[in-house]
A protein has these predicted regions:
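A conditional alpha-helix N-cap/helix-loop micro-motif detector
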Residues: 2-6, 34, 89-90, 131-134
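Pre-Walker A adenine-sensing motif
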Residues: 4-16
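Conserved P-loop
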Residues: 18-95, 99
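P-loop NTPase motor core
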Residues: 96-172
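Phosphate-binding/switch region of NTP-binding enzymes
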Residues: 143-216
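Short, surface-exposed amphipathic charged segments that create phosphate/polyanion-binding patches used
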Residues: 93-103, 194-199
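Conserved residues at the C-terminal ends of beta-strands
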Residues: 85, 111, 183
Length: 216
């Protein structure tokens, strides 16, 4: 188990991020998605873990990890245990699955998992092909995750469809992800929800320089 750094979220997840499943973190822009996965990465590093960070957006910033390491008094040399793979097209994202299969990482982060598929299949008439290719990708990824018993955390975005907010490629994501964490902001308050979950599934948080902290 890897702690998320948020006590209530860990409780809702049954102690943290589990092995052998894909955990889906999604939400609108500026709700703390990337900060949460970086926080999970730092907690994995503190346990001696090695991490594969697949960056499809070019937004990975090691200095943000340093900001999180310092309060925990962890050595900056731990960053050497993170392998960052910059992925610039859909084919590279498919090929990157083999890196997971051939290695023994303690944690894999994919940020953002759907972005390149939406970019390369951006036209209305390409929707079916986009869903077909993304389904193929997720099926291959899920198979490796199950076989290797590796925890994978995927970041995804929200899009507006007919003025309704919906997770990007939700119909496919829901087939292959086991836990969903939705992050949202209302006014100045941040809230997360965990699915599926019976009973109360919400947690509240603040975004700070050194990561996400619990809020009431």
């Amino acid at each position: 188990m890897i702690s998320t750094g948020l006590e209530k979220l860990d409780e809702l997840l049954g102690d943290g991020i589990k092995n052998g499943i894909i955990t889906d973190i999604f939400g609108a822009s500026s709700t703390g998605k990337t900060q949460l996965v970086l926080q999970i990465a730092v907690n994995s590093l503190s346990l001696g873990g090695t991490i594969l960070y697949q960056d499809t957006t070019g937004n990975f910033r090691p200095e943000r990890l340093l900001d999180m390491l310092k309060p925990k008094e962890l050595d900056a040399a731990l960053l050497d245990k993170i392998t960052v793979g910059r992925i610039t097209n859909m084919q590279e994202q498919f090929s990157a699955i083999s890196k997971i299969e051939q290695s023994n990482y303690s944690l894999v982060i994919i940020d953002n998992i759907t972005d390149l598929f939406s970019f390369e299949y951006s036209k209305e008439e390409q929707i079916l092909e986009k869903n077909k290719q993304f389904t193929k990708y997720m099926k291959q990824l899920a198979s490796v995750v199950f076989e290797k018993k590796i925890p994978v955390v995927a970041v995804n975005m929200i899009r507006k469809i007919n003025d309704i907010e919906q997770e990007n490629l939700d119909s496919v994501m829901s087939l292959f992800t086991h836990i969903k964490i939705k992050l949202s902001k209302k006014s100045t308050n941040y809230m997360g929800e965990v699915f599926p979950h019976s009973g109360e599934n919400r947690f509240y948080y603040k975004i700070e320089k050194n990561g996400l902290t619990s809020s009431t």
